[in-house]
């Protein structure tokens, strides 16, 4: 049984990120793995879901909604999320959700608090937004070889990783965290943050399977599926990025 907790699913869903949750459900069901989805909204401590969920998911949102979620995440859900990550639960945070994983998000005159789950800070830059198709090379524990993640990025924030943070991958095409470092995303144990959306997992089902296996604590590979259509979607996403 895979137990998933979606954080702010109605507010943080600007880029059809709900597709990531649907993909996780289907890939579990097709393998005969049970799937439960819980939601935690504004003002709701993680409580039992924080203690029992195997995977937490947070997507991207509009500026106003992201601001509301930032304060709630820091003041209401922070301790529960830290405890879950410490026991090995997986976390996938996309775009705005990724920005909220760090210490803070500076917006000029205002600074939004973060969950402090990973060592990073984000600053909204005066320059143009970083927009376009993107591909990164990723190396994750348990995978026999390096893999490519492909998607779309659209962010005004520049994310800088601290000394205790490890990037998710190396940029092959696109801008990445800040347009200059050559890195994209962050990974700490089973916690992953990334700017890639579109949504991310339907274009990169290998990452969905990695998250499922890690969340369930499985060492052996998941049973293979007929991924012809999924492979075609991945090839098209890479083609769009020029990789």
Language model feature labels by segment:
Residues 1, 52-53, 87-89, 110-113, ...:
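Short coil/turn connectors at secondary-structure junctions
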Residues 178-216:
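A glycine-centered loop/beta-turn motif at secondary-structure junctions
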Residues 1-86, 202-243:
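N-terminal beta1-alpha1 cap of cysteine-dependent amidohydrolase-like domains
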Residues 110-184:
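Pocket-forming structural segment of enzyme catalytic cores
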Residues 39, 97-99, 121, 159, ...:
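Catalytic metal-binding/acid-base residues of hydrolase active sites
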Residues 55-59, 92, 193-195:
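Structural motif
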Residues 63-140:
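Cysteine-nucleophile active-site neighborhood
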């Amino acid at each position: 049984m895979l137990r998933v907790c979606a954080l702010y699913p109605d507010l943080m869903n600007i880029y059809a990120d709900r597709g990531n949750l649907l993909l996780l459900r289907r890939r579990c069901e097709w393998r005969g793995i049970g799937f439960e989805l819980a939601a935690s909204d504004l003002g709701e401590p993680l409580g039992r879901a924080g203690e029992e969920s195997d995977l937490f998911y947070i997507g991207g949102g509009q500026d106003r909604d992201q601001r509301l979620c930032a304060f709630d995440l820091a003041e209401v859900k922070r301790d529960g999320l830290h405890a879950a990550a410490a026991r090995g639960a997986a976390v996938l945070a996309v775009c705005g959700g990724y920005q909220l994983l760090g210490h803070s998000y500076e917006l000029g005159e205002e600074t939004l608090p973060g969950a402090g789950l990973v060592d990073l800070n984000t600053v909204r830059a005066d320059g143009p937004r970083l927009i376009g198709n993107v591909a990164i090379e990723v190396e994750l524990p348990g995978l026999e070889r390096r893999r490519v993640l492909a998607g779309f990025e659209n962010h005004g924030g520049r994310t800088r990783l601290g000394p205790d943070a490890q990037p998710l991958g190396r940029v092959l095409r696109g801008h990445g965290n800040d347009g200059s470092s050559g890195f994209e995303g962050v990974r700490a144990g089973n916690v992953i943050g990334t700017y890639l959306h579109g949504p991310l997992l339907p274009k990169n089902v290998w990452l969905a399977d990695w998250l499922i296996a890690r969340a369930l604590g499985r060492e052996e590979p998941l049973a293979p599926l007929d991924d012809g259509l999924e492979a075609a979607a991945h090839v098209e996403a890479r083609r769009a990025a020029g990789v």
